A protein has these predicted regions:
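Beta1/beta-strand and adjacent pyrophosphate-binding region of the FAD-binding site
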Residues: 1-11
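N-terminal Rossmann-fold NAD(P) dinucleotide-binding loop
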Residues: 14
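Short beta-strand "acidic-cap" motif of Rossmann-like dinucleotide-binding folds
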Residues: 28-33
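N-terminal FAD cofactor-binding segment of flavoenzymes
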Residues: 34-77
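FAD-binding core of FAD-dependent oxidoreductases
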Residues: 81-89
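Glycine-rich FAD cofactor-binding loop and adjacent beta-loop-alpha segment at the N-terminus
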Residues: 91-95
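Conserved small/polar residues in nucleotide/adenosyl-binding loops
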Residues: 98-99
């Protein structure tokens, strides 16, 4: 099958882009995501802690050891399901102060 657009990564931006491109009926859009289409725990705000160390929902990346962290590796959660990291962040967001 032929596609006009192939989007790799079904995170927030990839999904938004695929949606926007597919609004034009002539466009054939393929959205690729390595993980599952969803995870039951991703819909419950309190359960994000269970997804952070779950290999089916998180790539489980770690930072490189650095002097400033006493040579520790710090977990860097990255979502591995449709919606990407937004699906494992516990539905949290940060609002800046108006004065910022």
């Amino acid at each position: 099958m032929d596609y006009d657009y192939i989007i790799v990564g079904g995170g927030s931006a990839g999904c938004a882009l695929a949606n926007r491109l597919s609004e034009q009926k002539k466009n054939k859009v393929l959205l690729l995501e390595a993980g599952k289409s969803s995870h039951p725990l991703s819909r419950l705000p309190i359960s994000f802690a269970m997804l952070v160390d779950n290999p089916s929902a998180n790539w489980r990346y770690r930072s490189e050891p650095e002097e400033g962290t006493s040579n520790r590796q710090i977990p860097v959660p990255r979502g591995k399901l449709l919606g990407g990291s937004s699906s494992i962040n516990g539905l949290l967001y940060i609002c800046l102060l108006y004065t910022s």
